[in-house]
Amino acid sequence: MTIAIGKSSEEPKGIFDTMDDWLRRDRFVFVGWSGLLLFPCAYFSLGGWLTGTTFVTSWYTHGLASSYLEGCNFLTAAVSTPANSMAHSLLLLWGPEAQGDFTRWCQLGGLWTFIALHGAFALIGFMLRQFELARSVQLRPYNAIAFSGPISVFVSVFLIYPLGQSGWFFAPSFGVAAIFRFILFFQGFHNWTLNPFHMMGVAGVLGAALLCAIHGATVENTLFEDGDGANTFRAFNPTQSEETYSMVTANRFWSQIFGIAFSNKRWLHFFMLFVPVTGLWMSAIGVVGLALNLRAYDFVSQEIRASEDPEFETFYTKNILLNEGIRAWMAAQDQPHENLVFPEEVLPRGNAL
């Protein structure tokens, strides 16, 4: 038996290679280079939200109770946006507003900017994670591309929209009821439901739900019965080489139902990707438009006729009056610092009243 003693021919690894080996090692929870962005940002944003909804009041920013400590529940608690007077300040803890005082920072709404910015980078980190893993296992990057839809909506609603307005104050607060209030605000001040980009977004999301239901049902309906298991989940070997369901039978079924059907699996699944992602992108584009105060559809001729003819009213003119009511009530309540007072005679009345 011969033993060779000598120097290894392998060169010592540099710091980058050492980090790369550790970060991309196969483990239960993959870390990766993207994890350096994802995990800290996700931890801080989620931790900030849990802290804010548990302990922090919105009395100084909105005149509201918004924490569990004040008696709110899961649906009514929120981390509210900074006060309108803070404009677009990043509200850094060490900045001129809070001056290192954590309590003051929370009172001014610093947790909102903390959560929004860390949340945005966490979402971007999650998309990069999908890119990184796809590259590692030699997949195409469509998962990451699809996730750009939710990212675009988050960034447009929580960051770009308030940047186009007078301050972070007009962004949504992080809470269930707070988001509902923001939706009413969007309708009243921007007539959002009549915006074509919102219509495309609704068509994309609901259309995707329909496609998902149809696709799942069709696959279940056309499974090959070649297994001996008791149910769908046990009848097939996960490493089987043959097709699990009959595309030919599915095509024949839907051809009879609609007169047209997908005959290509690749086109079918690309379409299921395309519909929701495009819908989300269109919604995000629409919100960017609202940041610039672009108008939705206006049917002024109907409004003029409704104002002149007491017997003429359409669903559109009724909605316009409803929007005026939302603005009249919401502006005074949401912006008490403006001291808005609307006399009774200027509040909107429909022709029916």
UniProtKB/Swiss-Prot annotation:
Binding site for chlorophyll a PD2: 198
Pfam families assigned to the protein according to its UniProt record, in alphabetical order: Photo_RC (PF00124)
Cofactor info, note text: The D1/D2 heterodimer binds P680, chlorophylls that are the primary electron donor of PSII, and subsequent electron acceptors. It shares a non-heme iron and each subunit binds pheophytin, quinone, additional chlorophylls, carotenoids and lipids. There is also a Cl(-1) ion associated with D1 and D2, which is required for oxygen evolution. The PSII complex binds additional chlorophylls, carotenoids and specific lipids.
Annotated TM spans: 41-61, 125-141, 153-166, 208-228, 279-295
Keywords: Acetylation, Chlorophyll, Chloroplast, Chromophore, Electron transport, Iron, Magnesium, Membrane, Metal-binding, Oxidoreductase, Phosphoprotein, Photosynthesis, Photosystem II, Plastid, Thylakoid, Transmembrane, Transmembrane helix, Transport
Subcellular location(s) per record: Plastid, Chloroplast thylakoid membrane
Membrane-related topology note: Multi-pass membrane protein
Chain positions found as Phosphothreonine: 2
One CC-aspect GO term: photosystem II
GO molecular function: chlorophyll binding; electron transporter, transferring electrons within the cyclic electron transport pathway of photosynthesis activity; iron ion binding; oxygen evolving activity
GO BP terms: photosynthetic electron transport in photosystem II
Positions bearing N-acetylthreonine: 2
Sites where the protein binds Fe cation: 215, 269
Binding site for chlorophyll a ChlzD2: 118
Residues where pheophytin a binds: 130, 143
InterPro entries (UniProt xref): D1/D2, Photo_II_D1/D2_sf, Photo_RC_L/M, Photo_RC_L/M_CS, PSII_PsbD/D2
Function statement: Photosystem II (PSII) is a light-driven water:plastoquinone oxidoreductase that uses light energy to abstract electrons from H(2)O, generating O(2) and a proton gradient subsequently used for ATP formation. It consists of a core antenna complex that captures photons, and an electron transfer chain that converts photonic excitation into a charge separation. The D1/D2 (PsbA/PsbD) reaction center heterodimer binds P680, the primary electron donor of PSII as well as several subsequent electron acceptors. D2 is needed for assembly of a stable PSII complex.
NCBIfam families on file: psbD
Subunit structure: PSII is composed of 1 copy each of membrane proteins PsbA, PsbB, PsbC, PsbD, PsbE, PsbF, PsbH, PsbI, PsbJ, PsbK, PsbL, PsbM, PsbT, PsbX, PsbY, PsbZ, Psb30/Ycf12, at least 3 peripheral proteins of the oxygen-evolving complex and a large number of cofactors. It forms dimeric complexes.
Miscellaneous comment in the UniProt entry for this protein: 2 of the reaction center chlorophylls (ChlD1 and ChlD2) are entirely coordinated by water.
PANTHER family named among the record's database cross-references: PHOTOSYSTEM II D2 PROTEIN (PTHR33149:SF12), PHOTOSYSTEM II PROTEIN D1 (PTHR33149)
The name this protein goes by in its record: Photosystem II D2 protein
Organism, scientific name: Chara vulgaris
Gene it is expressed from: psbD
